[in-house]
Amino acid sequence: MPRAPALLFSCLLGLCALVPRLPGLNICTSGSATSCEECLLIHPKCAWCFKEDFGSLRSVTSRCDLKANLIRNGCGVEFESPASSTQVLRSLPLSSKGSSPAGSDVIQLTPQEVTVTLRPGDRTAFQLQVRQVEDYPVDLYYLMDLSLSMKDDLENIRSLGTKLAEEMRKLTSNFRLGFGSFVDKNISPFSYTAPRYQTNPCIGYKLFPNCVPSFGFRHLLPLTDRVDSFNEEVRKQRVSRNRDAPEGGFDAVLQAAVCKEKIGWRKDALHLLVFTTDDVPHIALDGKLGGLVQPHDGQCHLNEANEYTASNQMDYPSLALLGEKLAENNINLIFAVTKNHYMLYKNFTALIPGTTVEILHGDSKNILQLIINAYNSIRSKVELSVWDQPEDLNLFFTATCQDGVSYPGQRKCEGLKIGDTASFEVSVEARSCPSKHVQHTFTLRPVGFRDSLEVGVTYNCRCGCSAGLEPDSARCSSNGTYVCGLCECNPGYLGTRCECQEGESQSGYQNLCREAEGKPLCSGRGQCSCNQCSCFESEFGKIYGSFCECDNFSCARNKGVLCSGHGECHCGECKCHAGYIGDNCNCSTDISTCQARDGHICSDRGHCVCGQCQCTEPGAFGETCEKCPTCPDACSTKRDCVECLLLHSGSSADNQTCQNLCKDEVITRVDTIVKDDQEAVLCFYKTAKDCVMMFTYSELPSGKSNLTVLREPECGTAPSAMTILLAVVGSILLTGFALLVIWKLLVTIHDRREFAKFQSERSRARYEMASNPLYRKPISTHTVDFTFNKFNKSYNGTVD
């Protein structure tokens, strides 16, 4: 699958190479070249015949044709057809070890100097080899964040120098160590600037009330092989305090990179810059918050006390400036950052070449192993970088890594061991000729290496026959210059021999100015003089051709741009620059833009067409078809290989089948799997014996998969029969008890609801007082009214 786009690209290039030979499509004769130089620019297969009596005296364009056609038509050997070429000027052999005292004779790249002579459109190639030699000197500068949050980290690295030197001497016999620290710019709002904080910014901070004033960067220890000096310098350090969360570490990184003499970087050594912090960095434009509008100048600003003096004068450096200065000084930057900021710094590594990132524990206890891992990672890969590439050059790379397989479009090899050699084929192609006859130079350098390859470029744009030009030649009626087999007439003269003056006309021969019978004279865009067309001038461009039938402005456009800006218009047809095809040259043949992060073209889920991925896998999308929720996951696709080769549990476990299944895998067997590896995907599946098999996979830039597999699957012990019986009985009893509890709970809830309802109805009842009509009281009361006449008295009372 990944070879398909490359094969398609090769076929397209092959088709383009055959175009001049196809009938009716001879680009050389249809280009209407009127001089040798114009002919050579049309196509690298075109040649110019400078034989005096060759071809039609009327047709100049017949001299520009394919070389085979010119020879067949009688040109002989009098033709110009230069080809691109390569010459190796200096090629010292690669070294095997780097343990010499001075290291000056250590060669890690060959050749060292090459010159290429280029004809536009004609590609030439050369090979270069890179080797990570054994026992190469190492300079390591430890740059530490000394803000208050790093207090516990400072305690844990006080003896780092001794331990680090012991481990590094297992890898190289020539190791040096340096130390520097940083906090942030000592201006508001980055630091506490009130007078009471000038000597102690920790005043009022209960957890740690005493610390040193804030500072930008301090270079504390030049690179030295005395590790006790490192330990002693670390013990002297005290933390400081800044106001905001981000730190000013990138100021320190830039100074450590450009102050070569102060730091003590050796010319012939591997340069490692370890950057430790627990927070995010300030970057360019952040300084404007503090009134710093001057961009960083990328220069060294350390005073006699080795303190950064421009901290409060210039803005923070940009990522582009950092990458440029680190690359100029061959420095590999190692970000040692806490886990919560890992992804941010991981994104930085894509913008700063030669940079790696490792996860630092909160107390820096893993810093030793972190540095060793980063060193091994750096030494296991080689990546080419290009410096000062001329704008009119195209470069094409093909990498051949340790597996011996060629990978077109790749300029990086990973998974190398010390002593392995990576080979690269570099093809160079000129798109056009420079306006002036100049020689360009560009440099190829592996990232982080001192060694480089200087490539000189000369352009083969002039014809050798031009050296024999004859001004006012008798061959040109003394009215022009004879050069390369034809006459270049002086102003006012026309004709193949400059025998006529402009304005002269012979009506009997005007048909010589017609392209075909019935066609207008000079295609209606010129004047027939001396039986030859003199083309009009146009504000849109140039009109040319024997019959003024051609121009350089009537070609297809893309978004209003002629030939998309990637080609030249010749006689109504776009002649595309190298690297572009199509009617309007809008289709790029560069497949690097289709390369996914894993190194595969369109993530193996599509084709690269005109520099863009067209996803063919159902459900795949993204710029490189990297997203595909419905695609079979990689764990499933790698399982057959793991089963067949390591577990022998596949349906066909013979060696040949396993080799076919695992042809694109690099397999490592281990006893334990690292489950929190940020660079790999953790996979696991259940075997036929109910065991769990785990493995991790990651993609190498070469296109292969790196599989790390357990030696044996993890199997649990089978439970006994008594355990199963007790579990079943216990579950039954527990279920019954649970059901009883639920039933009792439901009954209780129901009773409580009924009682509450009764109480509610009872409280709403009302009663009135009444008497029984059948009830009579035992006591009756009567009223008697009588008069005692005898005494003349009366009595009105009650008698019981």
Curated annotation (Swiss-Prot):
InterPro entries in UniProt: EGF_extracell, I-EGF_1, Integrin_beta_N, Integrin_bsu, Integrin_bsu_cyt_dom, Integrin_bsu_tail, Integrin_bsu_tail_dom_sf, Integrin_bsu_VWA
Bridged cysteine pairs (disulfide): C28-C46, C36-C463, C39-C64, C49-C75, C202-C211, C259-C300, C401-C413, C433-C461, C465-C484, C476-C487, C489-C498, C500-C530, C513-C528, C522-C533, C535-C548, C550-C571, C555-C569, C563-C574, C576-C585, C587-C610, C594-C608, C602-C613, C615-C625, C628-C631, C635-C683, C641-C662, C644-C658, C691-C715
Positions contributing to Ca(2+) 1 binding: S149, D152, D153, G362
Any GO BP annotation: integrin-mediated signaling pathway
Cellular localization per UniProt: Cell membrane
Residues binding Ca(2+) 2, per UniProt: D184, N242, D244, P246, E247
Extracellular face residues: 25-722
Membrane topology (Cytoplasmic): 744-800
Signal peptide interval: 1-24
Segments forming domain PSI: 27-76
Pfam families recorded: EGF_2 (PF07974), EGF_integrin (PF23105), I-EGF_1 (PF18372), Integrin_b_cyt (PF08725), Integrin_B_tail (PF07965), Integrin_beta (PF00362), PSI_integrin (PF17205)
Cellular component, GO annotation: cell surface; focal adhesion; integrin complex
Phosphoserine carried by residues: S771
Highest taxon listed in the record's lineage: Eukaryota
GO molecular function: integrin binding; metal ion binding
Membrane topology qualifier: Single-pass type I membrane protein
Residues carrying sugar: N347, N479, N552, N586, N655, N706
Binding locations of Mg(2+): S147, S149, E247
Protein's job: Integrin alpha-V/beta-5 (ITGAV:ITGB5) is a receptor for fibronectin. It recognizes the sequence R-G-D in its ligand.
Domain notes: The VWFA domain (or beta I domain) contains three cation-binding sites: the ligand-associated metal ion-binding site (LIMBS or SyMBS), the metal ion-dependent adhesion site (MIDAS), and the adjacent MIDAS site (ADMIDAS). This domain is also part of the ligand-binding site.
Subunit structure as annotated in this protein's UniProt entry: Heterodimer of an alpha and a beta subunit. Beta-5 (ITGB5) associates with alpha-V (ITGAV). Interacts with MYO10. Interacts with DAB2. Integrin ITGAV:ITGB5 interacts with FBLN5 (via N-terminus). ITGAV:ITGB5 interacts with CCN3. Interacts with tensin TNS3; TNS3 also interacts with PEAK1, thus acting as an adapter molecule to bridge the association of PEAK1 with ITGB5.
Name recorded for this polypeptide: Integrin beta-5
